[in-house]
Amino acid sequence: MASTIHLDVVSAEESIFSGEAEFVAAPAKLGEVGIYPNHAPLITTIKPGVLRVKVANGGEEQAIYISGGLLEVQPGVITVLADTAIRGHDLDEVKAIEAKRAAEEALRNNASGVDYARAQAELSEALAQLQTIEQLRKTTH
């Protein structure tokens, strides 16, 4: 029984992570999905949130912000195809707070249907980025 599984996390811009993991937790549309080696095959959509990776061989847990995309689990490999993926330590907290504030302001101003949906999506992404930053703080302290 394998104790690790290969993980590839890629966005449209770059490969964010490629390596062995002991555990991966992803923000699936219907709730968080936890994946250990030998997990059953799976394909699901992911929503904005924190992708948590327990790196193999005693590596520390990594937090990666994912804006959405697809997750595929096959024997021996997990692939995350993300719309946007940013390593937790690369996130800009000030920009995330400002994006959250701007989205909340747009929602308060009773934006039209399309603008309202966009503001909700932007708020969701900003909150997910802030959640990733907070999770990173917890794992480093």
Curated annotation (Swiss-Prot):
Membrane topology field: Peripheral membrane protein
Cellular compartment(s): Cell inner membrane
Record GO terms (molecular function): ATP binding; proton-transporting ATP synthase activity, rotational mechanism
Keyword Ligase applies: no
Cellular-component GO terms for this entry: plasma membrane; proton-transporting ATP synthase complex
CDD domains per record: F1-ATPase_delta (cd12152)
Superkingdom of the source species: Bacteria
Pfam families: ATP-synt_DE, ATP-synt_DE_N
Main localization, broad class: membrane
Protein's UniProt keywords contain Cell membrane: yes
UniProtKB keywords: ATP synthesis, Cell inner membrane, Cell membrane, CF(1), Hydrogen ion transport, Ion transport, Membrane, Transport
Subunit note: F-type ATPases have 2 components, CF(1) - the catalytic core - and CF(0) - the membrane proton channel. CF(1) has five subunits: alpha(3), beta(3), gamma(1), delta(1), epsilon(1). CF(0) has three main subunits: a, b and c.
Similarity annotation: Belongs to the ATPase epsilon chain family.
Cited function: Produces ATP from ADP in the presence of a proton gradient across the membrane.
Protein name: ATP synthase epsilon chain
Species for this entry: Methylobacillus flagellatus (strain ATCC 51484 / DSM 6875 / VKM B-1610 / KT)
Taxonomic placement: Bacteria, Pseudomonadati, Pseudomonadota, Betaproteobacteria, Nitrosomonadales
Name of the gene this protein is made from: atpC
